[in-house]
């Protein structure tokens, strides 16, 4: 499961600066959910292909109301949920009484805790870290988060060892993909060029992991129980590895699913909605672990900024998406039309996602959800060969030529699959990285229409072709050498 990293420490020690460094953002992907303090921020980081959830817990001031009182709130919850705790101190201010109190509580929690001395710019790192060894938390990692100094070493020493070595993925090289394409064009049979290892993988043999997420009280609990209570076979309730999330294997229409329930444990027959204890960590982990995400929104409240924040995390994770508008029953036609207008206005950027209007309480529209879930999963895991992708790319270029870059036309050579769930198309060519964003969006939409991809984001990656003459001297031919010799002798006589 994706590890959680909590940043803790006194106010103004640089937690937000380090948060932005690790997540490569200026703000959090998910923030300001009910039940959370406003200075809590959540973000997603990727280190050498390994994903982490970063939590900025806000300042803990041990001198104001007491460390115990402060840490008993949301910051303590984040520490309990975290796999790694980065305890940040201010190297310029030195060791403070609040640091001692926080360190004592972290030692009692027995978490993987690492001491980070920030604001060491302009200082000797060893001298800056010396005072903090008395906290008894092991080595001190000096950094300057505002300038990025020491952050790479911190990641290398703390985060990378935590996840261990990632198995090396077997990918089709550029030469293999190019050879496969031209072999298909010429009708030749090139052994090994048809990406045979992928033929052994059939996504239909695996259960679809389906996560139901949304803000509190939008009906996730009711929808979960409605799904489990209708014509399907529930195998058993199996606690998952995510904190408080429940993995529920089930079968519907002879298709296996694993329902990732983020609403907590409940009795199967209970469908009454209660105020849910919302956990951002639990929700983000469920999204990362799912194949398809059902995002539930309240028809009576419309699309809120919190819904859009959660939607942004789903898209950044590359997960397939089905939008569920719940509590549709009992609304007047005028109110329904208004809701649909707002959905069109605020969700125009996810036009690939199916939208379902349901009543989880009464069951209307719930059965149709699985049609879109299957469609999204099949589109996200579909295998498309190099020949087909290159043909679509050429059709797109014929319909709308690539623009000129520095007076030269961008040349698209060939395309091949770069990954699945979400689908990734890799386009090779000259100057392709200089293409405008508008043309990149055009190519993405063209591939989506041609492949009929629905319910899942699609990503386009661009790779420059190598110049075979780069770094080589321009050698003259024997004929050119003779001409050059005659020209030089003529100039000397003149």
From Swiss-Prot:
<dbReference type="InterPro" id="IPR006073">
    <property type="entry name" value="GTP-bd"/>
</dbReference>
<dbReference type="InterPro" id="IPR005225">
    <property type="entry name" value="Small_GTP-bd"/>
</dbReference>
<feature type="binding site">
    <location>
        <begin position="118"/>
        <end position="121"/>
    </location>
    <ligand>
        <name>GTP 1</name>
    </ligand>
</feature>
<dbReference type="Pfam" id="PF01926">
    <property type="entry name" value="MMR_HSR1"/>
</dbReference>
<dbReference type="GO" id="GO:0042254">
    <property type="term" value="P:ribosome biogenesis"/>
</dbReference>
<dbReference type="InterPro" id="IPR031166">
    <property type="entry name" value="G_ENGA"/>
</dbReference>
<feature type="domain" description="EngA-type G 2">
    <location>
        <begin position="208"/>
        <end position="381"/>
    </location>
</feature>
<keyword id="KW-0677">Repeat</keyword>
<feature type="binding site">
    <location>
        <begin position="56"/>
        <end position="60"/>
    </location>
    <ligand>
        <name>GTP 1</name>
    </ligand>
</feature>
<keyword id="KW-0690">Ribosome biogenesis</keyword>
<comment type="function">
    <text>GTPase that plays an essential role in the late steps of ribosome biogenesis.</text>
</comment>
<dbReference type="InterPro" id="IPR032859">
    <property type="entry name" value="KH_dom-like"/>
</dbReference>
<feature type="binding site">
    <location>
        <begin position="326"/>
        <end position="329"/>
    </location>
    <ligand>
        <name>GTP 2</name>
    </ligand>
</feature>
<feature type="domain" description="KH-like">
    <location>
        <begin position="382"/>
        <end position="466"/>
    </location>
</feature>
<dbReference type="GO" id="GO:0043022">
    <property type="term" value="F:ribosome binding"/>
</dbReference>
<comment type="subunit">
    <text>Associates with the 50S ribosomal subunit.</text>
</comment>
<feature type="binding site">
    <location>
        <begin position="261"/>
        <end position="265"/>
    </location>
    <ligand>
        <name>GTP 2</name>
    </ligand>
</feature>
<protein>
    <recommendedName>
        <fullName>GTPase Der</fullName>
    </recommendedName>
</protein>
<dbReference type="Pfam" id="PF14714">
    <property type="entry name" value="KH_dom-like"/>
</dbReference>
<comment type="similarity">
    <text>Belongs to the TRAFAC class TrmE-Era-EngA-EngB-Septin-like GTPase superfamily. EngA (Der) GTPase family.</text>
</comment>
<keyword id="KW-0547">Nucleotide-binding</keyword>
<feature type="binding site">
    <location>
        <begin position="214"/>
        <end position="221"/>
    </location>
    <ligand>
        <name>GTP 2</name>
    </ligand>
</feature>
<keyword id="KW-0342">GTP-binding</keyword>
<feature type="binding site">
    <location>
        <begin position="9"/>
        <end position="16"/>
    </location>
    <ligand>
        <name>GTP 1</name>
    </ligand>
</feature>
<dbReference type="InterPro" id="IPR016484">
    <property type="entry name" value="GTPase_Der"/>
</dbReference>
<dbReference type="InterPro" id="IPR027417">
    <property type="entry name" value="P-loop_NTPase"/>
</dbReference>
<feature type="domain" description="EngA-type G 1">
    <location>
        <begin position="3"/>
        <end position="166"/>
    </location>
</feature>
<dbReference type="GO" id="GO:0005525">
    <property type="term" value="F:GTP binding"/>
</dbReference>
<dbReference type="InterPro" id="IPR015946">
    <property type="entry name" value="KH_dom-like_a/b"/>
</dbReference>
């Amino acid at each position: 499961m994706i590890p959680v990293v909590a940043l803790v420490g006194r106010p103004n020690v640089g937690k937000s600066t380090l948060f932005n460094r690790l997540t490569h953002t200026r703000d959090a992907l998910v923030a300001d959910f009910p039940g959370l303090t406003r200075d809590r921020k959540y973000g997603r980081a990727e280190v050498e292909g390994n994903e982490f959830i970063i939590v900025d817990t806000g300042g803990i001031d041990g001198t104001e109301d007491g460390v115990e009182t402060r840490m008993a709130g949301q910051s303590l919850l984040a520490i309990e949920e975290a796999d790694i705790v980065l305890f940040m101190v201010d190297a310029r201010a030195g060791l403070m009484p609040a640091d001692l109190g926080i360190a004592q509580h972290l030692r009692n929690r027995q978490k993987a805790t690492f001491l980070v001395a920030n604001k060491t710019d302009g200082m000797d790192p060893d001298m800056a870290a010396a005072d903090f060894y008395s906290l008894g938390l092991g080595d001190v990692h000096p950094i300057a988060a505002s300038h990025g100094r020491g952050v790479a070493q911190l990641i290398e020493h703390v985060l990378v060892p935590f996840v261990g070595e990632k198995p090396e993925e077997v990918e089709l090289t550029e030469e293999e993909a190019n050879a496969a394409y031209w072999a298909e064009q010429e009708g030749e049979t090139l052994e090994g060029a048809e990406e045979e290892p992928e033929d052994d993988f059939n996504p239909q043999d695996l259960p679809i992991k389906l996560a139901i997420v949304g803000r509190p009280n939008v009906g996730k609990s009711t929808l979960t129980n409605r799904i489990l209570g209708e014509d399907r076979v529930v195998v058993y309730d199996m606690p998952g590895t995510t904190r408080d999330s429940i993995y529920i294997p089930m079968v519907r229409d002879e298709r296996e699913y694993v329902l990732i329930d983020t609403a907590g444990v409940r009795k199967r027959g209970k469908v009454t909605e209660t105020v849910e204890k919302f956990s951002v960590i639990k929700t983000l982990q469920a999204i990362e672990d799912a194949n398809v995400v059902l995002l539930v929104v309240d028809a009576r409240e419309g699309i809120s900024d919190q819904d859009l924040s959660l939607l942004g995390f789903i898209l950044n994770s590359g997960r397939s998406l089905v939008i569920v508008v719940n509590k549709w029953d009992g609304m007047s036609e005028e109110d329904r039309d208004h809701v649909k207008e707002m959905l069109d206005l605020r969700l125009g950027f996810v036009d690939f996602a199916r939208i379902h209007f349901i009543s989880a309480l009464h069951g209307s529209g719930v059965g149709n959800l699985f049609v879109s879930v299957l469609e999204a999963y099949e589109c996200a895991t579909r295998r498309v060969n190099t020949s087909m992708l290159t043909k679509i790319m050429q059709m797109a270029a014929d319909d709308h030529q690539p623009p000129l870059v520095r007076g030269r036309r961008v040349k698209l050579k060939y395309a091949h699959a770069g990954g699945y769930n979400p689908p990734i198309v890799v386009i090779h060519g000259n100057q392709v990285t200089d293409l405008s964003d508008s043309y990149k969006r055009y190519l993405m939409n063209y591939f989506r229409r041609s492949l009929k991809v629905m319910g899942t984001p699609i990503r386009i990656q661009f790779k420059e072709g190598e110049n075979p003459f780069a770094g080589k001297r321009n050698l003259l031919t024997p004929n050119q050498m003779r001409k050059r010799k005659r020209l030089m002798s003529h100039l000397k006589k003149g």
